[in-house]
Amino acid sequence: MEEILSVQDLKRVYGRGTAATQALGGVSLSVEQGEFVGIMGPSGSGKTTLLNCIATIDRPTSGSIRVGGQELTGLRGRALTRFRRERLGFIFQDCNLLDTLTAFENIALALAITKAPSGEIESRVREMAQRLGIEDCLDKYPYQMSGGQQQRCAAARAMVTRPDLVLADEPTGALDSRAAGLLLERLERLNQDLGATILMVTHDAFTASCCRRVIFLRDGQIFTQLRRQGDRRDFFRQIMDVVAQLGGEVQNVL
């Protein structure tokens, strides 16, 4: 399989001198095309910092990040903006939908910004909405949708441009268990049916158990990783065992 993401010896230090705090201490990892990978770790482990560096929201102190063979750490200005727009998709805990646009318009905006042919926009929006189970919400504004529908709309917006890599930061964090389950089910299907490559930060073992691989961070470094071999229930138990080693707590259970 083609390597979509390569992170090599990534370090991120905040502050200087005696006030310096190391958030990442030389993290190296890779993600292949079509993988669904989770990142877990206790508070302060560096998982959000890692995702932000890959997302080009934060700039690492040193190290290399390559997405689809493109080195990100040297990108600036228009080149960086274009890369984010065309090669990355983002799903955050806060949906960040535009209140004055319908669901259709929110999703279509991602394509319009990339200057996709106008004839393709409607069909691609409707296809992605159908895959995420929000085809009946396309004419609704965000305030007319449930939290789960809003988050699936945000996921459709992230996926509709067919990015190399989708970055998800606690996408189920603000959802109830039913809405979270629906979102995860749809993300799994997109991963399996379309080969979407997803890197997801989560604190929740149930959410992480939908991934095919989970990387655990502690104190800014990789502690261990697990690959899913059996069913989701078995993988969930394995994740819980590692979380217990890290001294964390698991809120959701199967």
Predicted regions and their residues:
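ABC family nucleotide-binding domain
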Residues: 3-213, 217
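Conserved beta-strand-loop-alpha-helix hinge in the C-terminal portion
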Residues: 221-245
